[in-house]
Amino acid sequence: MKRNRTQSSCFAILHIFIALGFTTILSSCYVQNITDDYKFLRQEAQERVTKTTGSIDELKDDRAIYLINAQQVKDYCKQHSNVIIYNFSPSYIMNKNLNANDFVDMCKANGVNALPIANSYLGLDKVRKLGVPVLMIRHQPYKTNKWRSYTKLFYKDVTNSNKRINNSKRFFSFKNGVYIGNFSTYEEALKSLQ
């Protein structure tokens, strides 16, 4: 009898650990952006999400969240002499993550066209007015909602490069529509245009 209670207790503890492990795995799906983060936007922000296929220059800074494709970005880069794209994560807070507003201000101060493009919906509804349209990668063409995957595929299309895209290098510079490189800091990207 004593032995059965001990076995029952062991099974109960085992079940608790299995349940905790399963819960941890499910919550890590959210953290790793395995789930579609669009559904975490507030209803008001979801209503502001707009698919667009026109020129980025025609978009307004009107609090809409514009879904863009790689061809629109390539066209924009061809129409402007110096462009720096900032692949930013709105909810990613680290000392190395440049604020999108600061990025836009720094580009304007240096006579460079700023193109901050969000790679995730998480926190995008909290981004304050940038002075440029709020742009988000349209990930549906890549048939994945994992931001690491669709971001690499998107920038591979934008750059027309066979080089490996490193997600930690968040700045892409273009001169007269030609891809110059992928950089870790704004300063490196700016220097590449001089």
Where are these regions (language model features)?
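C-terminal motif of bacterial Sec signal peptides marking the signal peptidase cleavage site
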Residues: I25-S28
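Thioredoxin-like thiol-disulfide oxidoreductase module
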Residues: L122-S168
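N-terminal secretory signal peptides that target proteins for export/translocation
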Residues: M1-A12
